[in-house]
C-alpha cells in the first residue's frame, strides 16, 4: 500500500437515516446535516426516469453525454466542448487531483472548507496548506497569495464555501486569479451557488474561457435535488478539456443520471421555487439567531454555520429529539441545513428548550 494512503483518515459518510433512527429508537428522524434539498426532486425527473427505455439497460450509456452536454452549454452560455461530466463532484475532485498533482506538490485552501480537497491531495502524495479565513469567515485572498510558492499546484475556492456559507464576489475572485501564476490551477467549486442571491453576477462560469488555469465545478445534487443520481460537471479551458476527457473513466455517468439531469434542467421553476423557499427560511434562521444572541456566518447557501456554547451537547440533544445536524467542522460550531418551514420551526423550538 502507498504510504500516502496508509496514513489517511477516510471521509466518513453519514449513516443511512433508517439505521440511525433505529439505533436511537426514534419514530422519525430528519436529516439536516448533509445539505440535501428538503423539497425533493422535480416531478419531471420522476416522469423521465419512469419513461426511460429499460430495454437499453444492457447497453452502455452515451459516454459523452451529448444531449445533456448541449443542454448545460445552452443553459450556462458556454462551449459544449469545455464540459467534463463526473459522478457527482467527488469524482471530479479525484480527477483534478490525479491530473495536476505529483508527489510532494502542495494544495492550498482557505480553511475551514470541504475536507475532500485535502483528502485527495494526500492520496496523490501531496501536501495540504491551509490559510485561515478572515474573522468574518470570508476568504483571506491576501493570505492565499502570500502562501503561493512554486510548490503550490492547486488552489481550491469553494463559493459559497462549505461549511461557512460565505460568498466571495466575482470581482474578488477574478482579481485573485489574475495574480496567481499561470502554472497554478485555481479550482472553483460552485456546488451551492444556485442558492446565492444574484448568483448570475457571482458565478465564475465564464472565467475558464479567459484563464486556462481556472476550472469551475457544478453539481445537480443540491438545488436540483439529484443527490442520489450522482452527477456533476466541471468547465475547463480548451487547453485542458480534451485531456480531462481522457482521464475520466469511460461511461462514468449512467443513462438514468443523464435522463434525470436533463429533466431537471427542463424544469427551472422547480429550482426557482426551491431557491425562493430556501431564501425565506434562511432569513428566518438568521433572525432567530439574532434574537437568541447566537454568532453565525452570513450564508448564501442552503445551510448556516453557527457558534454555540455546548455545541456538542446541543447536537446530541437535537438528534435524540429527531433532528440531525452537522458537527466536527470546527470546535464549538455547528452546521445545519435549512429545512422546510415546519422542520425549522420545530428545530428552533428545540434550541429554545435546550437553552432554557
Curated annotation (Swiss-Prot):
Keywords: Amino-acid biosynthesis, Aminotransferase, Histidine biosynthesis, Pyridoxal phosphate, Transferase
GO molecular function: histidinol-phosphate transaminase activity; pyridoxal phosphate binding
InterPro entries: Aminotransferase_I/II_large (IPR004839), HisP_aminotrans (IPR005861), HistidinolP_aminotransfase (IPR050106), PyrdxlP-dep_Trfase (IPR015424), PyrdxlP-dep_Trfase_major (IPR015421), PyrdxlP-dep_Trfase_small (IPR015422)
GO biological process: L-histidine biosynthetic process
Keyword Transferase applies: yes
CDD domains referenced in this protein's UniProt entry, alphabetically: AAT_like
Pfam families in the record: Aminotran_1_2
Pathway stated in the Swiss-Prot or TrEMBL entry: Amino-acid biosynthesis; L-histidine biosynthesis; L-histidine from 5-phospho-alpha-D-ribose 1-diphosphate: step 7/9
Entry-annotated residues carrying N6-(pyridoxal phosphate)lysine: 222
UniProt EC number: 2.6.1.9
Top-level EC class as recorded in UniProt: transferase
Top-level division of the source organism's lineage: Bacteria
Cofactor: pyridoxal 5'-phosphate
Reaction catalysis annotation: L-histidinol phosphate + 2-oxoglutarate = 3-(imidazol-4-yl)-2-oxopropyl phosphate + L-glutamate
Quaternary data: Homodimer.
Annotated family: Belongs to the class-II pyridoxal-phosphate-dependent aminotransferase family. Histidinol-phosphate aminotransferase subfamily.
Protein name: Histidinol-phosphate aminotransferase
